[in-house]
Regions:
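Short Gly/Thr/Asp-enriched flexible loops that form oxyanion-binding sites at enzyme active sites
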Residues: 24-43, 69-70
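N-terminal small/polar loop signature for handling phosphorylated ligands or for N-terminal nucleophile
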Residues: 1-29
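Structural motif
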Residues: 40-55
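Short, ordered loop/turn segments at secondary-structure junctions
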Residues: 21, 32-33, 41, 64, ...
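Short glycine/threonine-rich catalytic loop with a Thr-x-Gly-x-Asp
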Residues: 19-21, 35-40, 115-118
């Protein structure tokens, strides 16, 4: 998003929209050059849908969602359900609960009133719609959202070449159950 940040600042744009290769995820840049993750996007959309009476129930997020997002929803009286990482889990939880908004910090956002999978362009349009509705810039729409410090760390594995499964357990299960 660094190039987008620079472009937003250079052109004094209101918003920068960064899509991934297939367009199902997005990250935003506000007018101050700050990067907004999927958690920020979920917060903006939840506040917008709630204010317009279109939020059905609560919001589904993955286990990777920042605890600050969950607490912000609780303060607003919006239920928050955590599910395993992956848009298939988000969609399954939306279908099970009847809710209509879910997503991940990666920018995979599902608003099931519009689509059943992540669509960065539709999500970006909804964000612009929210900015217009509130007549506020992105930075203002997320000012009350306080994230807890977190860091994703990849841990080294000394035995990278060895399989990370137990072959003897697999053999036992295969012998115990046919097919």
């Amino acid at each position: 998003p660094q190039q987008c940040q620079a472009a937003v600042l250079n052109f004094q744009a209101d918003i920068g929209i960064c899509l991934d290769g297939d367009g199902d995820r997005l990250i935003l840049v506000d007018h101050e050059g700050n990067v907004l993750t999927g958690d920020h996007i979920l917060y903006i959309l939840a506040m917008y849908l709630k204010k317009t009476g279109r939020l059905k129930g609560g919001v589904v997020g993955s286990q990777m969602a920042n605890l600050g997002l969950e607490n912000a929803f609780l303060k607003q009286g919006i239920p928050f359900k955590r599910v395993p990482v992956g848009d298939k889990h988000i969609l399954a939880a939306l279908e099970a609960t009847g809710w209509n908004l879910g997503g991940e910090p990666s920018g995979h956002i599902i608003c099931s009133d519009h689509q059943r999978s992540g669509d960065g362009i539709i999500t970006a349009l909804l964000i612009i719609e929210a900015m217009n509705f509130f007549n506020q810039p992105l930075a203002t729409l997320v000012k009350d959202l306080e994230f807890y410090p977190s860091q994703l760390v990849n841990l080294p594995c000394n035995k990278r070449q060895e399989p990370l499964f137990n072959q003897s357990l697999i053999d036992t299960i295969e012998n115990q159950y046919e097919n």
